[in-house]
């Protein structure tokens, strides 16, 4: 299993998603979705090569669809760096 970390952009994306969830769906649903995203982070860390490469986004990146969002990440040695969480992409 790899360790994972969020870069600044991904942290901002996560905050935006949570705030949107609260305003649109209320706190309980926002927390459930927030937990789902962290479950996706754990799945990525468990086997980061399981998910496809994101050639159209950036070379060396991979992605994982999580709910209506797409998590973009890259693998650096024994660590996964979560780069961005983007809303509704077609891949």
Give residue spans per PLM region.
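Short, hydrophobic/aromatic-rich segments at coil-to-beta transitions
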Residues: 56-63
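Enriched for short, Lys/Arg-rich terminal
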Residues: 66-91
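Basic, Lys/Arg-enriched alpha-helical interface segments
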Residues: 1-55
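Generic recognition of cysteine residues
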Residues: 40, 64-66
